[in-house]
Design a protein with these regions (language model features):
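Hydrophobic topogenic segments
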Residues: 1-99
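Structured C-terminal helix/loop/strand segments within mature extracytoplasmic catalytic/sensor domains
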Residues: 94-122, 212-215, 258-284, 296-353
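Short, well-structured active-site flanking segments
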Residues: 165-182, 268-272
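Mid-domain, small-residue-enriched loop/turn segments at the edges of structured enzyme/sensor domains
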Residues: 194-195, 209-258
Length: 353
């Protein structure tokens, strides 16, 4: 690296000299090298480098030719093209490669339709992701937010329940956990719970109790096994999924739901079915609707709303994830309203009155 800098400096000097002065400049370096070599510690001061480096500099001087006008134009053109390319790619580099908060999704082989659904989102930032299983096709609103990882909040309970079932902390036949008597802000939480009731009312303490019996090590092993988002559980063990360290993107939510639906995890079928039953919101002749909301609260404000799930019809299965963000009022309930409007207008699901 240092020798390259010295050669570059020599070249800069030669550009300013007349051709007749090249030899004098080279002789100056040779004389300097000769004097330095006679000292007890040649090149100890680092001036000029070692003899091999000095030889390279002399060869550069001997072979130097001033660039012609055409060469200068070509050089400048190459420089400008390189600069333009670097500047053009800079936003992508800074946003995706250097930004660990985005899911690095290889979408090159995916069938994707980019849809503008901004009228549904209003003032909210966020994304809607839909995967059509039968046609192997994606519909995505706002790709940047579709790959942005944020806290899953209560949507994570789908998988936390599955971990507890797999380890026998709860079972499909007996998922009862007694209320400890502590008073919580929601009346439904102040009672004994089963998986069904805890999922319906999104009872935090139930899933925290499951985690406590599992232990952090086992939970982390499962998070890694299924590839849940950024797999980061460095936050407090009682709240790592609530606006803390664990984060996931809408696209990853949909990918995990497809694995849950067809049990790509290879878990016990009865445990998969127990979770599916717990998140089943509606069943009719039109199909079966599964879903889970999530709301992230920071400093008393709801800033992160989720609604994820899938719809099984007679001839297809659709997986979806909606995430909204704002300084306030970004709730799972509002994410649900947005989702249902989109699904209805897409003729995928019409809410039963």
């Amino acid at each position: 690296m240092r020798n390259d800098r010295e050669v570059a400096c020599d070249t800069s000097v030669l550009k300013m000299l007349e051709e007749d002065d090249y030899a004098d400049y080279g002789n100056t370096l040779i004389n300097f090298a000769e004097k330095i070599s006679l000292t007890p510690f040649p090149f100890a001061a680092g001036l000029g480098g070692n003899m091999k480096q000095m030889k390279r500099r002399i060869i550069n001087i001997v072979s130097y030719e001033k660039p012609t006008f055409i060469k200068r134009v070509k050089g400048m053109t190459a420089f400008m093209l390189t600069a333009v390319l670097l500047l053009g790619f800079a936003p992508f580099i800074s946003t995706y490669a250097a930004d660990g908060s985005h899911y690095q999704w290889d979408s090159s082989s995916e069938n994707i339709s980019y849809v503008d659904l901004s009228t549904y989102f209003g003032e909210y930032e966020g994304s809607f992701v839909l995967y059509d299983l039968e046609n192997d096709a994606w519909s995505i609103h706002d790709m940047e937010h579709a790959t942005l990882r944020v806290a899953p909040n209560s949507t994570y309970k789908i998988y936390d329940a599955l971990f507890g079932l797999e380890e026998g902390v709860i079972t499909p036949e007996n998922s009862f956990i007694a209320w400890n008597g502590e008073t919580y802000p929601f009346e439904a939480w102040n009672a004994d719970q089963t998986l069904q009731s805890a999922m319906n009312s999104s009872v935090n303490w139930y899933f925290q109790a499951v985690d406590e019996q599992l232990g952090a090590s086992d939970v982390y092993s499962y998070v890694q096994e299924i590839g849940y988002g950024n797999e980061n559980m460095s936050g407090d063990f009682s709240s790592y999924w609530m606006e803390s360290s664990l984060e996931i993107s809408p696209i990853e939510q949909v990918e995990l739901l497809t694995k849950l639906q067809n049990n790509s995890f290879g878990f016990a079928p009865e445990n998969i079915n127990a979770v599916k039953d717990a998140i089943c919101l509606s069943a009719s002749d039109a199909g079966t609707f599964y879903g889970k909301t999530g709301t992230g609260r920071v400093d008393g404000q709801d800033v992160n709303g989720w609604f994820i799930g899938y719809i099984e019809t007679a001839d297809n299965t659709y997986f979806f994830a909606t995430n909204i963000g704002a300084d306030s009022d970004a709730t799972g309930g509002n994410a649900t309203e947005i989702t249902m409007s989109i699904l209805s207008d897409m003729n995928i699901w019409v809410s039963q009155k």
